[in-house]
Each structure stands twice: as C-alpha cells, then as structure tokens.
C-alpha cells in the first residue's frame, strides 16, 4: 500500500507489451513521446538478445541438429527423385509417402520427447529393467509401429478413394505400409535409444536435438525401406495373404497394448493411439495435396522433388523443437497453459524463427547447388530460392502457433504433452507445410 492508501501499480514486465506506453506517449509532444517510449521500444530487442545469450548452448545444439537434418534430407530427396519409376508403376504411392515418413517422426519423436522430459525431471536411467522408463517407452513404441502401420494402409487407400485418386489395391497399400514401417522402425528405434542415452551421458538438450535428428533419420531410412516394400505389391495371391497377416498383426498389437499388464506402456498406448490416428489422416491428406501435382510439377522440375522431403521435415522438426521445449516447461511449471502466451514462449518462438530462416536458406541453396551439379532441372535460381524461403518462413510461423497451442491444450486437458503434442504438430505441419509449399509454387508462378 502507498501512503495515500492506494495499491501500487504492478510493473509491466512482459516483452512486446510496450504498445500501451507508445500510445500514451503519442498523446504528449513528439519530442516527449520519443523520449518516453524509446527505452520501451528497445526493451524487447534487449530481452531477445539476453535470452539468446542465456540459451546459446541450446540454440547451438538446435542449429547443428536441424542443419544435419536439412543436409541428410537431400539424401531422402534424391531417393524420392529416383523413385519416379516405381511411383508410376504403383499408382497413388505418393499418398503413402508423407504418412510413412511422418509416422517415424511421430512415434519416435514423441519417444525422444518423453525421454527428454524424464531426463529434465531426474527420472531417466540407463537400465534394462522392464519396469524402467526406458524399457516401457521402447515397448510402447514397438506396439505403436505395428498397429499404426496397418491403419496407415487402410486409411491411405480409403482417403485416396474418397478424393478420386487412382491407386493400387488395399492389400498392396497395407503390405507396403507395414513392411516398410517395420523395417524402417527397427533402425530408427535403435538410433533413438542411442541418441537418448548419449544425450543423458553428455548433457545434451534432447528437446532441441531429438526432434530434428530423429526426423532426419526417419526420412533417410524410410524411403529406401518403402521402395523395397513396393516389390511385394501386385504378386497375385501372395499380396492379399501378406496383407491379411499384416492386418492381423496390427490388430493383435493394438489389443495387446490396450490390455498389457505393463501399466506405463498401457497408458502410453491408450493415450497415444487415437492421436496417432488423427496424425495419420493429416499425413495422408498431405500426400493427397501433392499427389495431383506429382506428374506435372515434380517430374518437370526434379529439383523441387529433391527439396520436398527436407521442406516438410524441417517444418515438422522446428515445430517439434518448440513443442518438446514447452512440454518440458509445462511439466516443470515454468510456462502457463493459457490463450495468451507467456513472455518466455515468445522468446522461444524467436529462437524458432531464427533457426527457420537460417536452415531454409541452407537447404534451398544446397538443393540448388546439388541440382546444378547433377544437371537436374529447376524453374530458375532466384525463383527456386524465393519459393522455398517464402514457403518455409510461412510454415515456420504456422509451426510456432500450432506448437504452442497444441502443447497448451493437451496440458489443460490433463494429458501428456509429450504423447499428444509431437504427433499433432509433426503431422499437422506435414499437411500445412505441403499447403505452404503449394502456395509458394502458385505465388512464384511455378504451379
């Protein structure tokens, strides 16, 4: 209380909340207004710089991880460009590509996020104990892989049919999805566990390095495995039999996950599987957005085909970084889940924006150089760089918004942000990233 009995006015501490002072200042003379608002206008920039300095280790680790992801995505892009013959032979295959890649990031990105949270809260330990955090998370991820792979094939075929996209049979899709998913998941799972253990031992920030690196590994590994799985399609009676076995395996895994005596794994399956089904729909729609343009644009401009996996990967990875960081901060009580983001959320979003600008510039330049080296057609250097940067920045802003509100909503509903946020953000950004890329193609006159 002040001497006159009034409550002291609370000091405004949020960055970016200086507009009220600006408005009040403008009511005074111009010179006085400038004097009273100059220090407030400079304040947000100072706070951003100070936050970057305090988080420089995290920023550095995140930049290295996303840069590695962007570089390795070129391998996935070249693989995709080399799959043009199989995409022509297996009608509608592109519908299955984003969801096959996305599920690896959804399942194992969420796995890394949960393990990262356990590291922050002091619960993580390297152990083979079946009741331990590590074992139960790995067990649930294996069940998710089998169950979602079967659902992927069914949903991809159903949605493609509803949208009038011509595809191969349902059994072909189920076999390709499950065989490709199991092969790639075995590799990604092993590398995810290794990355988690090394992050724990070396003191890395798993929230910053997990999502981009696991997404990159998933991209590089999944496409070759999917390509191998396509050779099991169209084999007469063999393919329907394999498809039936695949569906049975998926249903059995789901039933076991819902009824297992392993309490933690059972909770993970029950919480995550419905969200993963929503993620599957979003990823299939992302493939459906690109499929009609695959023949006209991607085959005409192979350079755009090369950049597609990296473009979608980076968008999902950036959103995953923010979602994972916010998930840990929500658990620790550092961030409040409310409609208006806390100041620290805006500061984390500024890190995301800087990473996005840097990495999209890197991947667009690297793809253009690779296209020139390999004599792959592109719509012109400036146009290509412009459309990738425009689409990437647009997607980064969307990823920041989705990442925050998905984490806040799942937390307010008393769900685990690590289980729900990562899949929703990654798959949502696959769809929205594809839309942003198509929009960029239209704006720059390529589509």
Locate the predicted segments by residue.
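The first (N-terminal) embedded transmembrane alpha-helix
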Residues: 61-80, 151, 278-287
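Juxtamembrane helix-loop transition segments at the membrane interface in multi-pass membrane proteins
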Residues: 110-129, 190-212, 264, 298, ...
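Transmembrane helical segments that form the transport core of multi-pass membrane transport proteins
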Residues: 269-339
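Transmembrane helix-bundle signature of multi-pass membrane transporters/permeases
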Residues: 66-67, 94-106, 138, 142, ...
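Helix-loop-helix junctions within the multi-pass membrane cores of secondary transporters/permeases
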Residues: 111-164, 318-373
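Non-transmembrane, extramembrane segments of multi-pass ion/lipid transporters
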Residues: 19-56, 112-137, 250-265, 323-346
């Amino acid at each position: 209380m002040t001497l006159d009995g009034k409550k002291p006015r609370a000091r405004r501490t949020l960055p970016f909340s200086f507009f009220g002072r600006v408005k009040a200042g403008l009511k005074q003379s111009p010179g006085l207004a400038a004097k009273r608002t100059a220090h407030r206008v400079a304040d947000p920039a100072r706070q951003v710089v100070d936050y970057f300095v305090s988080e420089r280790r995290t920023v550095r680790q995140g930049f290295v991880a996303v840069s590695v992801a962007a570089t390795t995505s070129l391998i996935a892009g070249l693989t995709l460009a080399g799959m043009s013959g199989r995409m022509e032979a297996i009608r509608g295959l592109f519908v299955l590509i984003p969801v096959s890649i996305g599920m690896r990031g959804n399942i194992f990105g969420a796995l890394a996020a949960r393990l990262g949270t356990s590291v922050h809260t002091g619960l993580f330990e390297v152990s083979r104990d079946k009741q331990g955090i590590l074992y139960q998370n790995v067990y649930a991820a294996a069940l998710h892989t089998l169950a979602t792979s079967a659902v992927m094939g069914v949903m991809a075929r159903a949605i493609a049919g509803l949208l009038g996209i011509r595809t191969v049979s349902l059994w072909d899709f189920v076999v390709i999805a499950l065989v490709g998913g199991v092969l790639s998941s075995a590799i990604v799972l092993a590398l995810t566990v290794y990355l988690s253990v090394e992050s724990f031992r070396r003191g890395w920030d798993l929230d910053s390095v997990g999502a981009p690196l696991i997404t990159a590994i998933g991209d590089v590994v999944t496409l070759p495995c999917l390509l191998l799985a396509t050779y099991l399609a169209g084999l007469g009676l063999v393919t329907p039999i394999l498809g039936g076995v695949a569906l049975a395996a998926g249903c059995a895994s789901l039933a076991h996950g819902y009824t297992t005596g392993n309490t933690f794994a059972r909770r993970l399956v029950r919480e995550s599987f419905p969200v993963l089904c929503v993620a599957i729909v979003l990823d299939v729609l992302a493939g459906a957005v690109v499929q009609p343009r695959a023949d006209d644009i991607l085959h005409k401009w192979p350079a755009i085909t090369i950049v597609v996996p990296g473009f979608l990967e980076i968008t999902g990875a950036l959103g995953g970084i923010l979602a994972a960081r916010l998930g840990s901060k929500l658990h620790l009580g550092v961030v409040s889940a409310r409609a208006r983001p806390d100041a620290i959320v805006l500061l984390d979003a500024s890190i995301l924006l800087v990473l996005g600008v840097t990495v999209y510039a890197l991947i667009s330049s690297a793809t253009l150089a690779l296209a020139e080296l390999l004599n792959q057609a592109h719509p012109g250097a400036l146009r290509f760089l412009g459309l990738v940067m425009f689409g990437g920045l647009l997607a980064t802003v969307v990823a920041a918004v989705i990442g925050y509100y998905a984490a806040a909503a799942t937390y307010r509903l008393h769900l685990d942000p690590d289980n729900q946020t990562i899949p929703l953000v990654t798959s949502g950004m696959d769809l929205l990233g594809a839309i942003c890329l198509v929009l960029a193609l239209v704006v720059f006159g390529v589509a």
